[in-house]
UniProtKB/Swiss-Prot annotation:
Protein name: Protein BPS1, chloroplastic
Highest taxon listed in the record's lineage: Eukaryota
Organism name: Arabidopsis thaliana
Tissues in which the protein is found: Expressed in roots, hypocotyls, cotyledons, leaves, flowers and siliques.
Cellular component annotations (GO), alphabetically ordered: chloroplast
Gene: BPS1
Length: 349
């Protein structure tokens, strides 16, 4: 399979950040390491749950819903960790802020792209509903309208979405953010950067699967290497290896699309074409297509809700960070005035 961009040879150009959490600061580490261990244990568990029970579950809207729901939980988890670390924005180094803002805006762009594609797929649902209505009428004139609607639907499904086409560039730039910034004299900062690394890896891989499914191109699929020192590394590699191997086989098939529920509708449409052309439809033969259309529509709605949830979590995190930065700036100005008391306000994530 093609890769959007080979990841850097080493994700840690400034040295191994994991060894920085050493016993030199044993008193502080004894408080911080349980927080990190708990976060990474939960991360490993959430990643393990993404391994499909059956190969047929890969590239389904149900898996996509589960994956996006899992991302929401993980990103809420990092917000909780920041609060538990008692690491106010006033203690953040500028480069941490830059990294957070840069990554979050790219992820928001991906969310917008995924939402636009889900909306586009839902627009195709209207064509299917109109076609089914005419197929049930089962008259020559109605069957002609039905075939026209189904032809339009097929063209709609295979058409390109510019926002999805742009995902490859966004994913490639996100790969570069896997390099961890150097942290000086802040054990809390080291814990945060290590935790963020796990969040970024999970988010990047899942986003790549979404982009591959929506674009029909394996070039968006990620191949990431992670350190064996990480407690979630084995779970992640299992998910990646299992998913990538089967997705490769799916892309080698001759289906209209790679998304399972979407392909089920396309297959149902194809089976009805001979009867449409003959001018007569057995009402019973319509039921499988009706069921497939309903399953696809319901699934898309559920995935859309989870993507929207993820978008709101990202946006909330950015807004809170920016609000705290503005508050810090205001406090600095107030501190220079003899009429105002000095101090910095902090609101947790």
């Amino acid at each position: 399979m093609a890769r959007p961009q080979d990841p850097p040879r080493g994700f840690f150009p400034f040295g191994n950040p994991f060894k920085n959490l050493s016993s030199k600061n044993s008193v502080l580490s004894s408080k911080l390491l349980p927080l990190l261990n708990n976060f990474e244990t939960n991360l490993a568990s959430s990643i393990s749950k993404l391994v499909p029970k059956e190969k047929s579950d890969i590239l389904t809207v149900s898996w996509m819903k589960q994956a996006m729901e899992s991302l929401c939980e993980t990103h809420n988890g990092i917000k909780t960790l920041i609060t538990d670390l008692e690491l106010p924005v006033s203690d953040w180094e500028d480069k941490w802020v830059d990294v957070y803002l840069d990554i979050s805006v790219k992820l928001l762009d991906l969310c917008n792209a995924f939402s636009s594609e889900l909306t586009r797929l839902n627009q195709g649902h209207l064509l299917l509903q109109f076609a089914l209505h005419n197929l049930e009428a089962n008259s020559p004139q109605n069957l002609s309208k039905a075939q026209s609607s189904l032809d339009s639907w097929k063209q709609h499904i295979v058409s390109k979405n510019p926002r999805i086409e742009n995902c490859r560039a966004i994913l490639s730039s996100l790969v570069q953010t896997l390099n961890l910034p150097k942290v000086k004299n802040s054990a809390k900062g080291k814990v945060l950067m290590r935790a963020l690394y796990g969040v970024k890896v999970k988010t990047l891989y899942i986003s790549g699967v979404f982009a591959a499914a929506f674009s029909g191109s394996s070039q968006n699929l990620m191949y990431l290497t992670v350190s064996n020192e990480l407690p979630w590394a084995q779970s992640f590699m299992e998910v990646q290896n299992t998913m990538n191997a089967e997705i490769k086989n799916i892309f080698l098939s001759d289906g209209l699309t790679v998304l399972k529920e979407l392909e089920a509708v396309a297959s149902g449409v194809k089976k009805l074409y001979p009867a449409i052309q003959q001018g007569s439809i057995d009402p019973i033969s319509l039921q499988p297509l009706k069921d497939s259309v309903t399953e696809l529509s319901n699934g898309i709605d559920l995935v859309s809700k989870e993507v929207d949830c993820f978008f709101k979590i990202l946006l909330s995190g950015r807004d809170t960070l920016l609000e705290n930065l503005r508050s810090m700036g205001a406090s600095t100005l107030q501190a220079t005035s003899p009429k105002k008391a000095a101090g910095k306000n902090y609101r947790g994530f």
